[in-house]
């Protein structure tokens, strides 16, 4: 019997990229009766139906049959949650549960500051590297030494793309420890129902004769939606651009686009509506501009629906590993609004190219970024340890 402890930032019902990967890993191990697992994370205000979490509470519950220890938080600084109870809860689970393998989802500077002294020498340590600390430059410098200690202690470092290994100033120094396990999408979450097909048909009918472009994500600087809005101004009236999501830049984006009738802001998009727009669109727009976009799950999802993608070049990011320039879509120079508009126009003018890239996009996702692939890779990884 192997015991595995995952250290995630948060967990369902709070859903972000890291949390989804942690949940996928936990799900992938449920079928192995020789594995016992637990998860520890920060608590956060979040709700999904009757499932309700409160940030300040420390609670033990379960998700998908896996025990989750949620540590109450008293503050959040530079996106990092802070908790008085976390050190005690972590020490307790390390002693009582005595995991054979600990998986730390990085970055998590707060937990990293006290994890290593608590970690028994014979415990295998997997550092699951989601992204470099790039936005908070002061924090990055402050925790430089800590990060090196984590990498030194790690028995294995998991990256989500070879691009990130090559482009990270940290991972590139520890290539021998690195293994690439791409993030994944799950087919069952993206299977259209009859209702969804009807919604997609309605979207097409409402925009008959138009080239539909769809982009979705949080409205924050690194997502690059301001560049998509600017590119729209350079397009002709054949185009309709639907932008899903919300965030700190939503109002600024709407102000920027107020005289552009080609753009429609959808707000927060339900899972059903998201699939409907994936189905209905002609082109998937993914305008992220920095390495904070380490991979691009929404990009992979759009490609899964056989849509050509238009992305920017982001050195060291997995975005350009997911969308292959000239194979599954078009890649534009970073932040080049004119090039982005030209790429959309090129695809609009060439239905055969759209179909060619779209088919290749779907094939690439099916071959490299599906849940079954992640599950096999995680099983192999655990077997090695």
Residue locations for each model-derived region?
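Short alpha-helical donor nucleotide-sugar binding micro-motif in glycosyltransferases
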Residues: 151, 268-269, 276-281, 303
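Conserved donor-binding/catalytic core segment of Leloir-type glycosyltransferases
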Residues: 5, 202-223, 229-233, 242
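Nucleotide-activated donor-binding/catalytic signature segment of Leloir-type glycosyltransferases, i.e.
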Residues: 251-272
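Short hydrophobic beta-strand element within catalytic cores of glycosyltransferases
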Residues: 305-313
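Acidic donor-binding loop of glycosyltransferase active sites
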Residues: 279-294, 307
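A short, active-site helix/loop in glycosyltransferases that binds the activated sugar's phosphate group
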Residues: 152-192
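N-terminal subdomain of nucleotide-sugar transferases
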Residues: 1-55, 60, 64, 152
